[in-house]
């Protein structure tokens, strides 16, 4: 049976609808950086998605080709994730200013993926998909101490969940700890093309520190 990160790291991918404090281990991602409204047809965000999935599935399906990746095990491609921020803010997101978004869109990779394996997968995907993969990067993220919560509903309703997270953290002696390396983080467990807005499930995660 294929290794499923959502099941093996349930605390990180399937939190409850109540805020909780977690310590997130370092993880590797295939990532693309960009700017702008994620809902814009043909925008940077939507153009990033086939690149991410192209690399992730090339690595997963390497078992059927001549490439032998040391330590390989079959895995379920993890869900799409995103790190978001806006310039000249304290790390909080203003959902009314979608055109001002900066993002790192990404998909988690197994730790067996080396730089050499990653570069091979990018080259393979570029040939198969006939797309420009030059924006793709191998990213290592160490989030550490965070507060997180499962948000159910439209993306624009996330501020209510974030308010609950902020209150929960403050009551326990934590403060936000946003920086260039520690950002607003979302994990998308639902496909908005196939799921009603009120049923969308999104993990929201914010970096924190003890006061």
What are these regions (language model features)?
Residues 1-211:
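A solvent-exposed interaction/effector surface
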């Amino acid at each position: 049976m294929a290794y499923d990160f959502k099941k093996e790291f349930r605390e990180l991918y399937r939190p409850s609808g109540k805020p909780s404090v977690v310590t997130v281990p370092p993880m590797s991602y295939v990532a693309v950086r960009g700017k702008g409204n994620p809902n814009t047809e043909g925008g940077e965000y939507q153009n990033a998605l086939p690149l991410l999935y192209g690399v992730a599935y090339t690595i997963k399906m390497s078992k059927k080709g001549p490439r032998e990746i040391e330590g390989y095990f079959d895995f379920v491609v993890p869900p799409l994730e995103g790190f978001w921020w806006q310039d000249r803010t304290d790390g909080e997101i203003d959902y009314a200013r979608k055109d001002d978004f900066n993002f790192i869109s990404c998909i988690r990779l197994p730790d067996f993926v080396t730089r050499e394996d990653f570069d091979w997968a990018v080259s393979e995907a570029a040939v198969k998909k006939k797309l420009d993969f030059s924006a793709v990067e191998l990213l290592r993220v160490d989030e550490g101490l965070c507060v997180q919560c499962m948000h159910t509903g439209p993306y624009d309703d996330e501020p209510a969940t974030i308010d609950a997270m902020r209150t929960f953290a403050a009551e326990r002696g934590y403060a936000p700890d946003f920086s260039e390396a520690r950002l607003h983080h979302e994990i998308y467990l639902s496909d908005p093309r196939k799921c009603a807005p009120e049923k969308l499930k999104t993990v929201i995660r914010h970096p924190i520190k003890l006061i």
